[in-house]
A protein has these predicted regions:
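Catalytic core of membrane glycerolipid acyltransferases/transacylases, capturing the structured
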Residues: 10-20, 24-28, 40, 55-112
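Short gly/ser/thr-rich secondary-structure transition/capping motifs
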Residues: 40-48, 115-116, 175-178
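Generic preference for hydrophobic
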Residues: 47, 61, 84, 134, ...
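A short, well-structured juxtamembrane/interface segment
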Residues: 35-59
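Short acidic-hydrophobic, aromatic-tinged amphipathic segments that line or gate anion-handling sites
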Residues: 47, 105-108, 201
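A membrane-cytosol interface segment of integral membrane proteins
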Residues: 105-125
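Non-catalytic C-terminal accessory region of glycerolipid acyltransferases
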Residues: 118-225
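Membrane-interfacial terminal anchoring regions of lipid-handling membrane enzymes
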Residues: 1-18, 24-28, 51-54, 124, ...
Length: 225
């Protein structure tokens, strides 16, 4: 249903992703797109916020990843300008490739030079006021709600750019649609999320502090699963 609603809105997405000066409209369009998809699929959602979050300032938003519902849900419960970072294979996705060819940043982890360029592009976007959304596991969990080992990229980016990290726990998406839903099926229901308070990184710099930050985020996300 999310794919169907995407094609309904494709002309608008195409127009607003053609020029960087129009990117600030994309987040609102994504929210409308995902809300339509949820209505068509008989999904609703509930998000609890630990504190009021100022989404007008750039941050790095991280979440556990268990379902194809995660990305559309995150688009509906946050605001402000943002972009995603994801594996280069998403360029082959018929729905997502439009975004990863324009506003979002694909990363080829098998190519160090390409990975470096992707990280520099993300840093540029953050300095322009765009938050970054990524899944620190780098892939979907194979045994939800358990999380896999985190990649260091998100936390190094946060320390390098001195922006806070906003952890979001998706509590039950995998129960409604595990993975893509093709193998185990899917069912309508209420998706639930918990938006934790932002974690500051401006005073961090050493490798030890970076490792501790990763552990802190892991435990923060895990605390609500």
């Amino acid at each position: 249903m999310v794919a169907l609603s995407f094609y309904i809105m494709y002309p608008l997405f195409y127009y607003y992703t053609r020029k960087e000066s129009r990117y600030h409209k994309v987040a609102k369009l994504r929210k409308i797109w995902c809300d339509i998809g949820f209505i068509l699929g008989f999904y609703s959602y509930s998000a609890e916020y630990e504190v009021d979050v100022d989404f007008s300032k750039p941050m790095i938003i991280v979440a556990n990843h268990t379902s194809y519902l995660d990305t559309p849900l995150i688009c509906t419960i946050i605001s402000g300008n943002y972009h995603f970072m994801g594996k280069v294979e998403l360029l082959k996705n018929p729905v997502l490739k439009l975004f990863f060819q324009t506003i979002d940043v694909p990363v080829d982890r098998s190519n160090r030079i390409a990975s470096y360029r992707a990280l520099k592009k993300v840093e540029e976007n953050i300095h322009k006021g765009f938050s970054l959304i990524l899944y620190p596991e780098g892939t979907m969990s194979k045994n939800p709600p358990e999380m896999g080992e985190f990649k260091a990229g998100a936390f190094k980016l946060a320390v390098d750019t001195k922006v806070p990290i906003l952890p979001i726990s998706f509590l039950n998406n995998y129960k409604l649609m595990k993975g893509s839903g093709l193998k185990y099926g899917s069912r309508p229901g209420i998706m639930r999320a918990f938006v934790h308070k932002p974690i500051e990184t401006s005073n961090l710099s050493t490798p030890e502090e970076l490792e501790n930050l990763s552990k802190q985020i892991f435990e923060t996300l895990k605390s609500k699963l």
